[in-house]
């Protein structure tokens, strides 16, 4: 299974330098967001993709499908994380079936 990465040019470059092979970079224009939507749909339909990493900023602008497979994870970009603690707890609960408490 492959990991695909979708995000802004800086995030994409970082993952390329780290050795990721399926890395897709998108700007913020409406045309770029349309490209990102199309690429995400394509990646979800591929059998060889197991995980899709998408920056939180891009995920807010595209239609992220709710699918069990491949796993779609939102990651912070250079501006930091937009998730609060409660949202992160909910993601973990859905992923592993256990609620984390302090």
Swiss-Prot record:
Main localization is membrane
Q: Name one GO biological process term.
A: proton motive force-driven plasma membrane ATP synthesis
> Which organism encodes this protein?
Thermococcus gammatolerans (strain DSM 15229 / JCM 11827 / EJ3)
The annotated topology with respect to the bilayer is: Peripheral membrane protein
Give the protein's recorded name. A-type ATP synthase subunit F
> Which keywords annotate this record?
ATP synthesis, Cell membrane, Hydrogen ion transport, Ion transport, Membrane, Transport
Q: Which GO terms describe its cellular component?
A: plasma membrane
Role according to the record: Component of the A-type ATP synthase that produces ATP from ADP in the presence of a proton gradient across the membrane.
| HAMAP family referenced in this protein's UniProt entry, alphabetically | ATP_synth_F_arch
Family that this chain belongs to: Belongs to the V-ATPase F subunit family.
InterPro entries hit by this protein: ATPase_V1-cplx_f_g_su, ATPase_V1-cplx_fsu_bac/arc, ATPase_V1_fsu_sf
Q: Which SUPFAM superfamilies does the entry mention?
A: AtpF-like (SSF159468)
């Amino acid at each position: 299974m492959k990991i695909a990465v979708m995000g802004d040019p800086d995030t994409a470059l970082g993952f390329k330098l780290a050795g990721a092979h399926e890395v897709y970079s998108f700007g913020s224009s409406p045309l770029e967001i349309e490209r990102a939507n199309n690429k995400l749909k394509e990646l979800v339909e591929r059998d060889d993709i197991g995980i899709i990493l998408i920056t939180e900023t891009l995920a807010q602008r595209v239609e992220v499908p709710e699918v069990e497979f491949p796993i779609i994870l939102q990651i912070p970009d250079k501006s930091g994380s937009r998730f609060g603690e409660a949202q992160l707890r909910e993601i973990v609960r859905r992923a592993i079936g256990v609620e984390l408490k302090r």
